[in-house]
Regions:
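Membrane-interface helix-loop junctions in multi-pass transporters/channels
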Residues: 1-133
Length: 133
């Protein structure tokens, strides 16, 4: 499978922007709520919800044909959404919660992320479909 330079650049630019947005969002939320074990890592939970919402909006727009360029699609999904939302931080924070003995908080965080992520994706997709009518 060949990938064009344009696609690589779109993904790279999207990831650059997504990573910066993720960092700034994390700083903002962390400055307002306790986010270290045994507390819920709210910053990553919110970031993952917003990332799923963004992915839903993107996919909804793609399916309506409003964004047809495959390079731009890759830049928005793999790049922007991928750079913004992260499973690695989710895994690390759960490991820290479990090491701290906060088993219930870890379980709630895992469940909230999975259920909330799917719901946010569905909400974003539905919103994009409604707007694109």
């Amino acid at each position: 499978m060949a990938i064009s330079l344009k696609t690589v650049l779109c993904i790279g630019c999207g990831c650059f922007i997504g990573g910066i947005l993720r960092y700034l969002t994390g700083l903002y939320i962390s400055s307002r709520w306790a986010v270290v074990p045994p507390h819920m890592p709210w910053h990553t939970l919110v970031i993952n919800f917003v990332g799923c919402l963004m992915m839903g909006v993107c996919c909804g727009l793609f399916h309506k044909g409003l964004v047809q360029n495959p390079s731009v699609q890759a830049g928005l999904t793999a790049g922007l959404c991928g750079g913004y939302s992260t499973l690695a931080a989710f895994a690390w924070e759960n490991a820290e919660l479990l090491r701290a003995g906060a088993h219930l908080t870890a379980a709630c965080y895992m469940l909230a992320t999975l259920v909330g992520g799917v719901l946010c994706f569905m909400l974003g997709y539905a919103a994009a479909q409604a707007v694109a009518r």
